[in-house]
Amino acid sequence: MLGRCFPPDTKEKQQLRMTKLCDPAESELSPFLITLILAVLLAEYLIGIIANGFIMAIHAAEWVQNKAVSTSGRILVFLSVSRIALQSLMMLEITISSTSLSFYSEDAVYYAFKISFIFLNFCSLWFAAWLSFFYFVKIANFSYPLFLKLRWRITGLIPWLLWLSVFISFSHSMFCINIXTVYCNNSFPIHSSNSTKKTYLSEINVVGLAFFFNLGIVTPLIMFILTATLLILSLKRHTLHMGSNATGSNDPSMEAHMGAIKATSYFLILYIFNAVALFIYLSNMFDINSLWNNLCQIIMAAYPASHSILLIQDNPGLRRAWKRLQLRLHLYPKEWTL
């Protein structure tokens, strides 16, 4: 998301109403590289929307047909809806900020994008963390009484936890408005010449920033890391036990366990990269038009798409539905030619 520039020590800084823009910061990137980045981002957005739309459609159809949906399916519906909305929002924001910067920089428009962006990102982080938590409780092999009690109650807890995550994400997105503001200094002298250079400064509420990121990003990140790591360790231990019983490396159960370990490891890596990129991006560590800032955007756009594709490949029901869809798409052109 692009930032705005507020001239310091003005009424606009105090009132934050219909602020005049400073001239956009000079881009460090060539036009070709900017075009390439935009093309990559748009491709990632479209892939993410298609993949998450497929996941949502399959589980929504199951929900309507059976008047019920599995707990994992419920989480996936919440997750896919948040990601479709997020990818669509980011694609719309790039389009508006590139074609009508003055309209995008109006207070109402800018803050609508800012709040929606953070809300949907935090929802996505929380829903993915609850999905990892659910898989951990259902699959991991631990015999602790508290863990067994949690496994028995997890189905009833998940709907409440999902809506609690929505409330937490919305609260944090509303709280974020005055955490960081970018200011423009129009009269920074260049000592080697008689000219001046435009510089951009950030003012950050450190206490608010710490509270904001701890509950919004760090908490679901820690939960995801812990549950995914414990699940991998449990699966690895069970796999070693199966190997010691000489079941053979080609045993379907052994292959299923190894596949689950790989999938969980990929999920963990993707989640960490996305959370770190989001943290850096929202912290305003780099200039708006810098290569590092654009790299964070690419990572954030790639995560929903790649994670959803892995979910389709790893879930037998979704994988079968995807193959049926591919088969129908291949048959339609043949029917049209008859």
Curated annotation (Swiss-Prot):
TM regions (residue ranges): 31-51, 75-95, 117-137, 157-177, 206-226, 263-283, 292-312
Misc: Most taste cells may be activated by a limited number of bitter compounds; individual taste cells can discriminate among bitter stimuli.
Name of this protein: Taste receptor type 2 member 39
Membrane topology: Multi-pass membrane protein
Protein localization: Membrane
Residue intervals annotated with topology Extracellular: 1-30, 96-116, 178-205, 284-291
GO BP field: detection of chemical stimulus involved in sensory perception of bitter taste
Glycan-carrying positions: 185, 194
Pfam families for this protein: TAS2R
Main location (coarse class): membrane
Gene: TAS2R39
Alphabetical keyword list: G-protein coupled receptor, Glycoprotein, Membrane, Receptor, Sensory transduction, Taste, Transducer, Transmembrane, Transmembrane helix
Family: Belongs to the G-protein coupled receptor T2R family.
